[in-house]
């Protein structure tokens, strides 16, 4: 999916922080990620950004779909195993086209992506381990409450930001759980 940032808030933020106005931002995904889209659309609408979907159905479409992006646009990648499996190619293309990407997991940023915000995977595994422990101690699995992730992490790659010609705001860096330099 791709979202176009033409709203006043995007322009005002850019002016106040000495950045060029965002032209668009958005998401690419292999499927609609039904649970993910309403949140993205609501947040975009509140900032005056319109959202359009770009579906990537196979590896051949990756370059075809991403090559249409321009600098000052952006892409958000929702959780998706297809995107994760092809992350090296996606990161390479976005870097070549100078388009920032926001990803769902830290490993994208470790591999050269710009920013990730997502579930803290080790914490999620610990949470699962606690469930296994309770089951092994005799708790009926049907008696265990459903749980959602409780810990999320923000990771920023400053080397990638520099390669893209972006200045990451100090407020974002201060909130980051990890900054890769």
Where are these regions (language model features)?
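Short hydrophobic alpha-helices and adjacent helix-cap/hinge residues
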Residues: 1-181
């Amino acid at each position: 999916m791709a979202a176009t940032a033409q709203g006043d808030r995007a322009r005002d933020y850019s002016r106040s922080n000495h950045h060029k106005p965002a032209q668009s931002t958005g998401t690419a995904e292999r499927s609609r990620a039904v649970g993910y889209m309403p949140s993205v659309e609501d947040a975009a609408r509140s900032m005056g950004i319109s959202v359009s979907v770009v579906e990537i159905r196979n590896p051949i479409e990756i370059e075809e779909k991403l090559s249409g992006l321009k600098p000052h646009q952006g892409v958000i990648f929702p959780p998706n195993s297809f995107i994760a499996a092809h992350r090296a190619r996606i990161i390479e293309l976005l870097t070549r086209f100078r388009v920032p990407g926001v990803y769902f997991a830290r490993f994208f940023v470790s591999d050269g992506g710009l920013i990730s915000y997502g579930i803290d995977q080790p914490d999620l595994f610990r949470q699962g381990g606690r469930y296994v422990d309770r089951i092994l101690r005799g708790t009926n699995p049907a008696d265990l409450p459903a749980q959602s992730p409780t810990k999320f992490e923000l990771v920023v790659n400053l080397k990638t930001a520099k390669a893209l010609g972006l200045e990451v705001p100090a407020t974002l860096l201060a909130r980051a759980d990890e900054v890769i330099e």
